[in-house]
Amino acid sequence: MSYRFWRWMLPVAVIVLASGMLDTSAPAQGTPPYWPTEGWRVSTPEEQGMDSARLVAMFDAVEKADYALHSVLIVRHGYLVTEAYRYPYDQATPHDVRSCTKSVISALIGIAIQQGHVAGVDQRVLDFFPERAVANLDDAKRSITVENLLTMSSGFDWPGGILEPILGEWTRSDNWVQFVLDRPLADPPGTRFVYNTGGSHLLSAILQETTGVTALEFAQQNLFGPLGISPGRWESDPQGINVGGAWLRLTPRDMAKFGYLYLNGGQWDGQQVVPADWVATSTHEHIRAGGQWLSDGYGYQWWIDQAGYYMALGYGGQYIVVVPDRDLVVVFTSGLPTQDFFAPETLLNTFILPAVQSSAPLSPNPAAVADLEAGIRTFAHREASAVPPLPETARRVSGQVYAFDPNDEGWESLRLDFADEADTAQVTLDGIPLTVGLDRVFRLNDTPRPLIGYWDDPVAARGAWKSDAVFAVDAQPVGVPESYTLTLAFDSAEVRIRLRENVTGRGDSLKASLRG
C-alpha cells in the first residue's frame, strides 16, 4: 500500500474501520451477467456483497471534510451500487477527465498495434515524423521508442514534475508536437520516470500519422462505439491533433465503462476491443515513479498501486480505479485543490474497499440503504437554506456600475443587483448577467463567451455576504475541475476584488470604481 494512503488517511476513520481493511473477496467468476452498452443496471450494495453502512460513513466523511467532489460511482459485479452527483452535475454531463485521457490514448495505441498501424512498442518515435527537422538531435533522441512515451521515460527535459509548469509554454507554442520533439534530453531514454503530457501528445500524433484519422475518430470506431460511449469534446492542438494527455470529456458512467472494459481484460460483449495482452501489459508496473509526488509504479499510461489496483488519474481529482481482486470499478470526478488530490484514494481505502464483504450477496439492510440514499441527497447540495437579510451595503451598491482598472482578466465593468427577500442576485460582468443563488444553491447560466477563466461552459454561481461589506461569489464552469471564488470588498466609491482559482489556489487582485 502506498505511502500517500497513510499520509492522507482520515484519522478517525482509520480507528473505526481498521479491522475492515483486512477483508478480501474474490471477484465474480465467468461471463458478466450483462453488458452495460446501453446503460448500467443498478443494485443495492448488499445485493453485490457490499456494506451500505460503510458507504454511508464515506459520504459523512466527504461532507465533514467538504471535499470538492463532483461525482462518485461504484460498480461491483457489473452493477452500479452507488451513484452520486453534486449539483449542477448529473449523469448526462460530460466531465473533463484531464490526464485520465492518457489511459484512453494507451488503449488506442494497443488497438493500433493489433491492427498493424504501429509495428510495436519498440518502434522509434522519430520514424513517425521523417519530414520534421528536429532540434537537439543525437543518437539518444533517435533511440526514443513508443514504449518510452508510454512509460514516461522518454528522457526529454520536461521540468516541474507531476504539476508540469512547462504546460503553459507548451500550449502557447505554434506547434505542440514540434515543441516536444525539439526539447533536449535530460536523461538517457528508458532510465527515469518524468511525468510528461507532451510525450502523451506524441502518442496521439502517432495515431493520427499512422491511421489517417484523429484519435477521437479512431476511438469512436474502435473503442467508444463498441462500449456505447458518447464522448463530449476532445480538445485539439493548432494542427488539429487531439491532445494526447488531457482534455477529453466523458460522463462518469462512460468513465466507468472504460474501467469495466479493463476489468474484463479488454473484452466487451463477445468482442476483444482492446487486446488482452495489452491490458495486462499496460496495467503492469514498468517503472517506478518515486520522487514525483506519486510513489507507486507506472505502466502504459496507468498508475499501478502496490495494493493491487490500478488507476487512471487526472488533474483536480479525476479517477478511474480498477480493483481486479474485488471485481470493482470506482469513478470520481472532482475539482479538488492540490492538497486534497489524494482524497479519493483515501476514501477508496478507508471506506469503499472495506465495504466489500463477500463475493455473494449480503443480507438485506434496508435501513442502511435508506441512510445511503439520504447521504447521496446531502452530497448533491441541492437543499436550499434560508436567505439572511441583506446588509445595508447591498442596498447601496445595487444597480451601481463600477469600472475596472486595467487587469489581466480583461474585465471592464461590473454591476450587482440585489432585492430584499429574493433568493438570487444578479452579477453583470462586461454586460453578461450571471444569476447567483443566495440560498446556497448554484444557479446555471449560459454565457456567450468565456467569462471567468478560459472555459466556454455554462457557469453555475452562488454567493453570500461574508460581512456587511464583503460579498463572495462561487463560480463553477460546468464540466471542468476549475472553479473560482470572487471576493468583493466594498467601500464608499470602489470595490476591491480578489479572484481565486480553487484547484491551484492562484489568484489575482482587481479594483473597480464607481462610474461618475
Where are these regions (language model features)?
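Active-site helix/loop module of the DD-peptidase/beta-lactamase fold
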Residues: 115-156, 182, 213-250
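Active-site Gly/Thr loop motif
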Residues: 231, 279-330
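Active-site SXXK
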Residues: 51, 56, 78, 95-121, ...
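A short, well-structured edge-of-sheet supersecondary motif
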Residues: 59-90, 327-330
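Peripheral terminal and inter-domain segments
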Residues: 365-516
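Catalytic-site signature segments of enzymes, centered on catalytic residues
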Residues: 91, 160-248
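Active-site-proximal alpha-helical segments within enzyme catalytic domains
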Residues: 199-206, 244-267, 318-335
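Structured C-terminal helix/loop/strand segments within mature extracytoplasmic catalytic/sensor domains
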Residues: 314-385
